[in-house]
From Swiss-Prot:
Keywords: Disulfide bond, Ion channel impairing toxin, Knottin, Secreted, Signal, Toxin. It is found in: Secreted. Putative ion channel inhibitor. It comes from Cyriopagopus hainanus (Chinese bird spider). It comes from the Eukaryota. Disulfide bonds join C66-C81, C73-C85. Belongs to the hainantoxin family. 17 subfamily. This is Hainantoxin-XVII-2. GO terms for cellular component: extracellular region. The presence of a 'disulfide through disulfide knot' structurally defines this protein as a knottin. Expressed by the venom gland. One of its GO terms (molecular function) is toxin activity. Residues 41-64 form a propeptide.
Length: 98
């Protein structure tokens, strides 16, 4: 019984290094797959961040076009005007009062 327990702790450094490298490699692949899956489910995430940043910028609001009522923001790539239109995270753009 003691020889089995002792042999488990007498692993060569090469085997330990290989196990650690394998674990790190698989962890990296798992994280990369999560990132790719998230990007596939939310393809406009980067555009959304740019949209939110532009909507908070009052100096450049005249350079952006207002979306038509119920026009889909992500499909049309239209940045809403500050104060007149709202582009929610998901769904359609809408104007105040529509």
């Amino acid at each position: 019984m003691t020889t089995v327990g002792v042999s488990l702790f007498r692993r060569s450094p090469e085997k330990i290094t290989m196990k650690i490298a394998t674990f790190l490699g698989l962890s990296f692949l798992l994280i990369a797959s999560y990132v790719l899956i998230c990007e596939a489910q939310h393809p406009g995430f980067q555009e959304l961040l740019i949209l939110e940043e532009n909507m908070r910028d009052p100096e450049n609001s005249k350079e952006r076009s207002c979306a038509k009522p119920r026009e889909n923001c992500n499909r049309m790539n239209i940045l809403c005007c500050r104060g007149e239109c709202v582009c929610p995270t998901f769904g359609d753009c809408f104007r105040y009062g529509d």
